[in-house]
């Protein structure tokens, strides 16, 4: 990559980070302006268009980055699990670590999931579906269950995890610890329920063949 290309990439990165830094519990992406983001990144507003067509394209890039960041962290968690440790507890700790280190990235996913922009809703839905698919792949490999079961289990787990994440954004350390423990319990219940449901279906199938 040449010097100019490197500089362009650094400026693009600065715009993304500037936009993330301006998000908060009180401020959503929709309230950001091109001028504010450009000023925070240290460039002229007119230079913004060398990197993004408009603010919406910047936002969609941020959604993609947030989803990818979360998936990469969860992949690392699965690598740690392979070396020993509780699957669910390690996954929950990793997820909470993501929220703690990247609260605005998670806020963006939460808000735009049900926001007014169809493009943003579709982008967040796509990221969540990627997350569900990767978890379903892992469950299918580890638990030796059919895809239909692991997808249903993964979707239930991701729904609960995102709901808990929304609560974690606004609590203190002790409340966060309690939420983590509750989430671990809920995910274990889903996991055991999926296993016993699958086993029951297998027993029913075996019985029907005997008859």
Swiss-Prot record:
Annotated PROSITE patterns: HTH_TETR_2 (PS50977)
DNA-binding region: 33-52
Pfam families given in the database record: TetR_C_46 (PF21943), TetR_N (PF00440)
PANTHER family referenced in this protein's UniProt entry, alphabetically: HTH-TYPE TRANSCRIPTIONAL REPRESSOR FABR
Oligomer and partners: Homodimer.
Principal place of residence: cytoplasm
Protein name: HTH-type transcriptional repressor FabR
Compartment list: Cytoplasm
Keyword Hydrolase: no
Domain HTH tetR-type stretches: 10-70
GO cellular component, one term: cytoplasm
One GO MF term attached to the UniProt entry: DNA-binding transcription factor activity
Keywords assigned by UniProt, alphabetized: Cytoplasm, DNA-binding, Fatty acid biosynthesis, Fatty acid metabolism, Lipid biosynthesis, Lipid metabolism, Repressor, Transcription, Transcription regulation
Functional description taken from the UniProt entry: Represses the transcription of fabB, involved in unsaturated fatty acid (UFA) biosynthesis. By controlling UFA production, FabR directly influences the physical properties of the membrane bilayer.
UniProt record, GO biological process: fatty acid biosynthetic process; negative regulation of fatty acid biosynthetic process
Entry keyword annotation includes Lipid biosynthesis: yes
């Amino acid at each position: 990559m040449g010097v100019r290309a490197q500089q362009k990439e650094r400026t693009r990165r600065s715009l993304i980070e500037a936009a993330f830094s301006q998000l908060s519990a009180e401020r959503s992406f929709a309230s950001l302006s091109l001028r504010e983001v450009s000023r925070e990144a240290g460039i002229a507003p007119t230079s913004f268009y060398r990197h993004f067509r408009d603010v919406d394209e910047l936002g969609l890039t941020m959604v993609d980055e947030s989803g990818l960041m979360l998936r990469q962290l969860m992949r690392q968690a699965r690598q740690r699990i392979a070396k020993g440790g509780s699957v669910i507890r390690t996954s929950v700790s990793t997820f909470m670590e993501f929220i703690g280190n990247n609260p605005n990235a998670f806020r963006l996913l939460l808000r735009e999931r049900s926001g007014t922009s169809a493009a943003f809703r579709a982008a967040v839905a796509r990221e969540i579906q990627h997350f569900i698919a990767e978890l379903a792949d892992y469950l299918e490999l580890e638990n030796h269950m059919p895809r239909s079961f692991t997808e249903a289990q993964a979707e239930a787990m991701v729904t609960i995890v995102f709901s808990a994440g929304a609560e974690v954004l606004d609590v203190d350390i002790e409340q966060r610890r309690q939420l983590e423990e509750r989430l671990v319990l809920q995910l274990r219940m889903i996991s055991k329920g999926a296993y016993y449901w699958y086993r029951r279906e297998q027993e029913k199938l075996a019985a029907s063949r005997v008859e």
